[in-house]
Design a protein with these regions (language model features):
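Predominantly extracellular beta-rich ligand-binding scaffolds that present long acidic/polar faces
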Residues: 1-128
C-alpha cells in the first residue's frame, strides 16, 4: 500500500507499506510512534531533519526489514527498548535491489512481494 501521510501511532501491524515525498512535521516516514510491528516497509523522501526518523520517530516494539532513502540520517529517532532492523539505501553499498531482497525475505504467509519498479523504487506486486 502507498499512503500519502504517515500513521500517527501504530498499535497493530503495518506490512509492505511504502511512503514517498516530503514531510514538514517532526515525524517518521512510516509512523510517528510504533507500539506494534512494522514489517518490510520503505520510505524515500525528505524529512524535517531535527527529531525525525525515516521509518518511525519513536519505537517501542518491532521494526523488521525496513529500508529508507532520502535525507534522513537514521531509521528511528528514539528507540525505547524495541527491536530495529532498518537500513539506509545509500546507492553505493546498499541499493534498492538489496532492499527488495531483504523485504521479500520478511514477507511470509501472503500473496505479495516487492519488485524493483521502472522508476528505480520498489513496487508491490502479486506473486506470480
Amino acid at each position: 500500500m502507498t499512503i500519502s501521510r504517515e500513521v500517527n501511532q501504530n498499535y497493530g501491524e503495518i506490512i509492505a507499506c511504502s511512503v514517498t515525498g516530503k514531510l514538514n512535521a517532526y515525524s517518521g516516514g512510516i509512523a510517528n510512534s510504533n507500539y506494534g510491528r512494522i514489517i518490510a516497509c520503505w520510505f524515500d523522501g525528505t524529512l524535517k531533519e531535527y527529531e525525525s526518523g525515516a521509518i518511525v520517530r519513536y519505537n517501542y516494539n518491532t521494526i523488521t526489514s525496513c529500508y529508507w532513502g532520502g535525507n534522513a540520517g537514521q531509521g528511528v529517532f528514539r528507540n525505547h527498548g524495541g527491536t530495529v532492523d532498518a537500513t539506509k539505501v545509500d546507492g553505493a553499498t546498499v541499493k534498492w535491489q538489496t532492499a527488495v531482497d531483504g523485504m521479500n525475505t520478511a514477507l511470509t504467509d501472503n500473496d505479495y512481494q516487492w519488485a524493483l519498479g521502472t522508476g528505480g523504487l520498489p513496487v508491490l506486486q502479486k506473486k506470480q
